[in-house]
C-alpha cells in the first residue's frame, strides 16, 4: 500500500475517533519498543504511519492494541 488513508482503516475500526485513539496508542507502543525511523525501515516512516498501516492491513487488531496498552 503506497499510502495509508483513514478510509483504509475505517473497515477495521468503528469511528474516526476510535481510530485516532488506537493509532496513537499503537504508535506510542512502537516507540516504547525502541523503534527508530531511520534504522528500522527503509521508507523512514514515522511511528504513526506504521501504526495506521498495521491497522489498515489487519496486522494488529483494535483488541490487541487495547490489550497491549493495559498490559503495559
UniProtKB/Swiss-Prot annotation:
EC number: 2.7.7.6
A GO biological process held by the record: DNA-templated transcription
Organism: Francisella philomiragia subsp. philomiragia (strain ATCC 25017 / CCUG 19701 / FSC 153 / O#319-036)
Quaternary context: The RNAP catalytic core consists of 2 alpha, 1 beta, 1 beta' and 1 omega subunit. When a sigma factor is associated with the core the holoenzyme is formed, which can initiate transcription.
Listed name of the protein: DNA-directed RNA polymerase subunit omega
UniProt GO molecular function: DNA binding; DNA-directed RNA polymerase activity
UniProtKB keywords: DNA-directed RNA polymerase, Nucleotidyltransferase, Transcription, Transferase
Reaction catalyzed: RNA(n) + a ribonucleoside 5'-triphosphate = RNA(n+1) + diphosphate
Protein task: Promotes RNA polymerase assembly. Latches the N- and C-terminal regions of the beta' subunit thereby facilitating its interaction with the beta and alpha subunits.
Family, similarity comment: Belongs to the RNA polymerase subunit omega family.
GO CC list: DNA-directed RNA polymerase complex
